[in-house]
Amino acid sequence: MATIKDVARLAGVSVATVSRVINNSPKASEASRLAVHSAMESLSYHPNANARALAQQTTETVGLVVGDVSDPFFGAMVKAVEQVAYHTGNFLLIGNGYHNEQKERQAIEQLIRHRCAALVVHAKMIPDADLASLMKQMPGMVLINRILPGFENRCIALDDRYGAWLATRHLIQQGHTRIGYLCSNHSISDAEDRLQGYYDALAESGIAANDRLVTFGEPDESGGEQAMTELLGRGRNFTAVACYNDSMAAGAMGVLNDNGIDVPGEISLIGFDDVLVSRYVRPRLTTVRYPIVTMATQAAELALALADNRPLPEITNVFSPTLVRRHSVSTPSLEASHHATSD
């Protein structure tokens, strides 16, 4: 990895001159600027954005990196962090990472370049070592929905595996033994942990796992439609379905309704997250509550305290999800059980 000394050597200037160019000092000549920027580009050198921000002093700005701000889950996260920023006299800047390593990294670096000393970051694809390097550069950076070894006190996460176990166990307690699962096709720990939680609950109850009852799709409504359509196409040998999140569950419910399959009379359905859509689909969706508002609020408060070197607030580093009972789950009817057995 290139250093500031490498840039200075290639540009034919001193390290101090490189520093002046990086910090936009008026003392740097135009020729020096051109030489330094050319060297930085040739070496793919990314300056320590945090050092620049600190050198310029920080503005009253909180940075937030989310997966996709159009996702209702991340919308709730944004609103919670924005409320903390507002009540503490700060502005909020947002970057989208889209569960892509390069875009997550760019979003973080862009926010630091905009002098955000307090950062709340949802990043699932950046490797631990690289993320640790960024955490060392940024004392006010807090991770949400991820635990990074060595920085546990600056991380706030949810026990996703337990949440999926809770959802699946609820279906089992209602008498279901043939349970499908609609999983996210994103290669992130959330998807892996929730799928494992589903398998855990089945194994604990002595129910053999059947991979034909697991389908994958984008973690949104259209992905839920596609995954449920695929599951139905394999034969209706199930009486209940657990979903990666509420958006997939909403899409799945639409497919079931379109096919004249009653929820929960013929097939029970359970989601995960408890976002707004769960209250407005019909029937209202039984789900697992992800306390994202509380978690995001604590993350923002912690980031601001760390950035200002103030006493740290009391926080919970790993939250436990809870079951929210609504109207999309019931005991399997005789007709549903017959369908599942005969198909």
UniProtKB/Swiss-Prot annotation:
The keyword Repressor applies. PANTHER family: HTH-TYPE TRANSCRIPTIONAL REGULATOR GALR, LACI-RELATED TRANSCRIPTIONAL REPRESSOR. This is HTH-type transcriptional regulator GalR. Residues 4-23 bind DNA. It comes from Escherichia coli (strain K12). SUPFAM superfamilies: lambda repressor-like DNA-binding domains, Periplasmic binding protein-like I. CDD domains: HTH_LacI, PBP1_GalS-like. Residues 1-56 form the HTH lacI-type domain. Gene3D superfamilies: 3.40.50.2300, lambda repressor-like DNA-binding domains (1.10.260.40). One of its GO terms (molecular function) is identical protein binding. Homodimer. Pathway: Carbohydrate metabolism; galactose metabolism [regulation]. The gene is galR. Keywords: Carbohydrate metabolism, DNA-binding, Galactose metabolism, Repressor, Transcription, Transcription regulation.
